[in-house]
């Protein structure tokens, strides 16, 4: 039997493995559209990243419940339009496979086409291959068949292709880096009243071809399993995971993997509004040749894994002793002029920006917990028009910043015009207070989906500014906490030195 999304056919035997309990979500970070594979005793997971760079985060685990961030497949997005923020564009729903000693990541950028990234070490540098210049393809997944053939399944974005809700299969070259035919439609959701069929993942198990894909849209959707004797179908269809009576809405896009001990699992996301798309782990059983996910087809709130616990966590705080931490992403392709690694400390140079929403040098990370405080210590060396601060990004966003002798709190709103037109952005002052000093500590507090801000000269003397405000989603993302130094007068300004970023999970 060929294991789904594994690096081999052998089962693993782990001596002394004890049952480990886990609770969903296993990750609070916005790891949207996850895919997962096993290679030997190691599990690897990737996710979407949209306009944030470096892109396609690569995570590693040995127990499926605890994950570490080990790198990114895309160091830059290879087009000049991503040298500035391109919200809702960029990296959509990648897939990951391991074949003949090589890791593969496939992704479609819906406006630019199909890419493959390859690496022998998933924590190292990845090589980018531009496979096909095409508009409107999304969510690609390869299948390296046991007879040497290579297939690709994908969906479509209606906003670009004029069609959606259907899945196509293409033949690929033996190395998986060339599409060699026009493809064939293998599933049309309209035939089964399935709307928004997307995110397909292709597998082969016991001679059968499988496509797992979500349908029904993101929040109220469900998981489909499609099964056929040929990659081209016809496919039988079954709903294998839905919300049921649980609080886990729309169990959406994800990946199927075996644990090497005879047990199958499904990792998927749940849309939690401003918190983004958090990661869940479901057991998979089998009945009449079909997968049954969760508990009788409904998501579980937690469970048991018979694997040794893996000590791992994703970093949040940073004193920049070793340079810029792995958790940070820019809002566009990074410019070397934006920052200097002081080791310790980080120098942010004031790049020109009309708004925080349009600032490529907004440096952010994913929220890793529901409630937390983020404290940042700045020493500013400002010129006219410079501001340095922290904020939480979304289509409605908030930030607190020091500039021109004042601490200011502002709200920004970005309104979509069209996919080719930059959003219309307005920023409105909420409150401000005089601050004649060059150094400041700023705090952002997140509680129950709301954010509030504080300022002062140290951790024990911080005062609130403004009230409590609801966080909102971004372009297919959750809200993102981050920091910045920018110039509002359209030119390069001075700089600020960031002494530390301390993120404390609320008890």
Descriptions of predicted regions:
Residues 2-507:
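Carbohydrate-active catalytic/glycan-binding domains of CAZyme proteins
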């Amino acid at each position: 039997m060929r294991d789904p999304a594994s690096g081999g056919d052998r089962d693993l035997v782990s001596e002394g493995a004890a049952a480990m309990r886990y609770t969903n979500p296993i990750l609070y970070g916005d790891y949207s559209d996850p895919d997962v594979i096993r290679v030997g005793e190691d599990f690897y997971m990737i996710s979407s990243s949209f306009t944030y760079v470096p892109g396609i985060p690569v995570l590693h685990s040995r127990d499926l419940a605890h994950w570490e961030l080990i790198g990114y497949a895309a160091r830059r997005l290879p087009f000049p339009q991503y040298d500035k923020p391109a919200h809702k564009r960029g990296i959509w729903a990648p897939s990951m496979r391991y074949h003949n000693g090589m890791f593969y990541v496939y992704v479609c950028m819906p406006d630019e086409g199909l890419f493959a990234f390859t690496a022998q070490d998933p924590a190292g540098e990845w090589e980018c291959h531009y496979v096909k210049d095409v508009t409107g393809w999304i969510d690609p997944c390869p299948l390296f068949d046991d007879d040497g053939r290579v297939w690709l399944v994908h969906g479509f974005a209606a906003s670009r292709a004029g069609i959606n809700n259907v899945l196509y299969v293409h033949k690929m070259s033996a190395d998986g880096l060339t599409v060699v035919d026009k493809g064939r439609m293998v599933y049309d959701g309209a035939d089964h009243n399935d709307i928004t069929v997307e995110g397909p993942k292709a597998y082969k198990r016991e001679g059968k071809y499988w496509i797992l894909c979500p349908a029904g849209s993101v929040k109220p959707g469900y998981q489909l399993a499609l099964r056929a004797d040929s990659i081209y179908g016809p496919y039988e269809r079954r709903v294998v995971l839905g919300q049921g009576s649980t609080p886990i809405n729309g169990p959406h896009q994800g990946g199927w993997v075996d644990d090497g001990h005879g047990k199958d699992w499904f990792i998927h996301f749940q849309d939690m509004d401003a918190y983004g798309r958090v990661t869940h782990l479901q057991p998979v059983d089998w009945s009449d040749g079909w997968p049954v996910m969760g508990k009788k087809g409904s998501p579980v709130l937690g469970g048991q894994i018979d694997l040794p616990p893996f000590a791992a966590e994703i970093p949040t705080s940073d004193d920049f002793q070793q340079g810029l931490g792995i958790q940070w992403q820019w809002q566009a392709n990074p410019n070397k002029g934006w920052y200097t690694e002081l080791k310790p400390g980080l120098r942010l140079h004031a790049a020109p920006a009309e708004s925080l929403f349009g600032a490529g040098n907004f440096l952010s990370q994913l929220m890793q917990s529901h409630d937390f405080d983020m404290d940042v210590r700045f020493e500013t060396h400002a010129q006219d028009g410079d501001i340095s601060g922290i904020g939480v990004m979304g289509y409605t966003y908030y930030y607190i910043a020091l500039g021109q002798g004042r601490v200011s709190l502002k709200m920004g709103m970005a309104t979509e015009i069209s996919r080719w037109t930059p959003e219309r952005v307005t920023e409105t002052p909420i409150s401000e207070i005089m601050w004649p000093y060059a150094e400041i500590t700023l705090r952002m507090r997140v509680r129950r989906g709301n954010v509030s801000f504080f300022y002062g000269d140290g951790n024990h003397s911080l005062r609130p500014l403004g009230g409590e405000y609801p966080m909102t989603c971004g372009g297919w993302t959750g809200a993102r906490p981050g920091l910045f130094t920018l110039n509002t007068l359209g030119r390069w300004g001075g700089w600020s030195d960031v002494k530390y970023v301390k993120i404390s999970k609320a008890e």
